[in-house]
Amino acid sequence: MQRSRTAADDAALLLAGLGLRESEPTAGSPGRVRRGPRAVDEAAPASGRRGKGGCGGPEAAPDVPSRPERGPRASLAGSDGGSARSSGISLGYDQRHGPGPGPPSGGSARSSVSSLGSRGSAGACADLLPPGVGPAPARSPEPAQFPFPLPSLPLPPGREGGPSAAERRLEALTRELERALEARTARDYFGICIKCGLGIYGARQACQAMGSLYHTDCFICDSCGRRLRGKAFYNVGEKVYCQEDFLYSGFQQTADKCSVCGHLIMEMILQALGKSYHPGCFRCSVCNECLDGVPFTVDVDNNIYCVRDYHTVFAPKCASCARPILPAQGCETTIRVVSMDRDYHVECYHCEDCGLQLSGEEGRRCYPLEGHLLCRRCHLRRLGQGPLPSPAVHVTEL
């Protein structure tokens, strides 16, 4: 590298010498410069000897100091980092005394030195080349080379063919958990909150009151905001209140009165038949059994009865045993036999003499006599050998 740079510097000096010879003024010439620089202030080859090319070249100048000059006279050839010597052609003189007839420079002397010096002496002599010969094309800077080889990092196993087996397993488990969560959410759906209109998910978020569903956070006291789930509350004017606010905030003035005892209902209220009751006051008028949560019925006078006492009081009486005809156990339909405008139990409808069970079948028909239920044979025996009457018509109601 040092030899090639020295040869390039010598060639540059030779071309500079030729330029100086052409630029010498003649007798009739005012001393104008044809090409290249007008004069050379300094030219110091690296070795301090004559340049190649023989006659016409500049003589060797004394050794320049190791510290190169700065400013417009700086050398065009870059200095070598391993040598204390410097060489090159100074362009500062022509640029200080005006441009020559040659091609104009693209920038200042300092910028030209820095740009050409990095490319060597051949680039510095672009203005000294013969006509028709252009400078070498500029090269882009090569990427920096690392002095040591970079280590190659191995790829994780399975990356060339997509995700690894562990990643696929993790993705499958994630999808399975999402499906399980969606299924659980669907199972825990209770309905729509009547207050906010949103869905209710989870047993802890559901609250049922007054025949409607609420969110636990939606069913609260309108006065203090306390949650009323599992607590006593009072409904006043389509608003609900906790027990404390209802009792100590003047709401007792609007409290309902029990239809039985006439007292204010300050605790739980039971509403039936358009009236309000204490739970303990809603009882059967016959047996006095509490009917809270128990089926009941009423008569024409709105008297309350349990089902058993209602049938006992209002059910038809059997003409044979004088007991009421009630529905069978577990059945709501009353079955009775009507004969001679009288009601009978099915088991009480039999012959009074022989006990034969009477019905509408042949041989079991009823032949009444003087208000008595008799079969055909017993009827003839009571009449002797007299003519037989026609069998009595009986009706069985189901």
Swiss-Prot record:
Residues 74-90, 106-124 have a biased composition (Low complexity). It comes from the Eukaryota. Gene3D superfamilies: Cysteine Rich Protein. InterPro entries: Ajuba-like (IPR047172), Ajuba-like_LIM1 (IPR047245), Ajuba-like_LIM2 (IPR047247), Ajuba-like_LIM3 (IPR047248), Znf_LIM (IPR001781). Residues 191-252, 256-315, 316-385 form the LIM zinc-binding domain. Residues 132-157 have a biased composition (Pro residues). GO terms for biological process: cell projection organization; cytoskeleton organization; miRNA-mediated gene silencing by inhibition of translation; miRNA-mediated post-transcriptional gene silencing; negative regulation of hippo signaling; regulation of cell morphogenesis; response to hypoxia. GO terms for cellular component: adherens junction; cytosol; focal adhesion; nucleus; P-body; plasma membrane. Keywords: Cell junction, Cell membrane, Cilium biogenesis/degradation, Cytoplasm, LIM domain, Membrane, Metal-binding, Nucleus, Repeat, Repressor, RNA-mediated gene silencing, Transcription, Transcription regulation, Zinc. SMART domains: LIM. GO terms for molecular function: metal ion binding; transcription corepressor activity. Adapter or scaffold protein which participates in the assembly of numerous protein complexes and is involved in several cellular processes such as cell fate determination, cytoskeletal organization, repression of gene transcription, cell-cell adhesion, cell differentiation, proliferation and migration. Positively regulates microRNA (miRNA)-mediated gene silencing. Negatively regulates Hippo signaling pathway and antagonizes phosphorylation of YAP1. Acts as a transcriptional corepressor for SNAI1 and SNAI2/SLUG-dependent repression of E-cadherin transcription. Forms homodimers. Interacts with EIF4E, AGO1, AGO2, DCP2, DDX6, LATS1, LATS2, SAV1, EGLN2/PHD1 and EGLN3/PHD3. Interacts (via LIM domains) with VHL. Interacts with CD2AP and WT1. Interacts (via LIM domains) with SNAI1 (via SNAG domain), SNAI2/SLUG (via SNAG domain) and SCRT1 (via SNAG domain). Interacts with ROR2. Following treatment with bacterial lipopolysaccharide (LPS), forms a complex with MAPK8IP3 and dynein intermediate chain. Interacts with PRICKLE3. This is Wilms tumor protein 1-interacting protein. It comes from Mus musculus (Mouse).
